[in-house]
Amino acid sequence: MIVCSPESLPGAGAFIRRSISRYHGGHWTQTARERREWLLYALSPLDVYVLADDDGAVLYAWCAVDASRNAVGYCYVRAEYRRLGLAVALLTSAGIDLTRKTLVLEPTRASVAIAARPGYNLAHVV
């Protein structure tokens, strides 16, 4: 499992940057503050990833289905599904099995709040 920035994913960084640029109307920045706040949550090794900001709002989710981590399929998380719990429910309803997988979060304000919810199997990266 990994927690990293979008640009550190081999083969997927450009795809993700283009996608997020479209989401923000063509605006993509690389400031130090944004690198800290844009977190990549790994829901499982190499297959499902969710991009969220520092407040826990899920912005984008996609599936990487090959060993090179190319993002060959994705599931856009609409505004009404921009909370992490709802995104997990959305991915599960799409047929992605998350029952045996651990959600890895960096210890931010968002992860502390989410970890307090019942029903989540969380391992903090410290």
What kind of feature is each model-predicted range?
Residues 77-97:
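Conserved acetyl-CoA-binding loop-helix of GNAT-fold acetyltransferases
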Residues 55-63, 70:
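Glycine-rich phosphate/pyrophosphate-binding loop shared by adenosine-nucleotide-utilizing enzymes
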Residues 97-126:
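Conserved active-site alpha-helix within GNAT-family acetyltransferase domains
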Residues 1-34:
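Short amphipathic alpha-helix that is part of the acyltransferase structural core
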Residues 41-45, 66, 96-99:
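Flexible, charged surface loops at secondary-structure boundaries
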Residues 26-54:
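Active-site rim helix/loop that mediates acceptor-substrate recognition in acyltransferases
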Residues 68-79:
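Conserved acetyl-CoA binding element of GNAT-fold acetyltransferases
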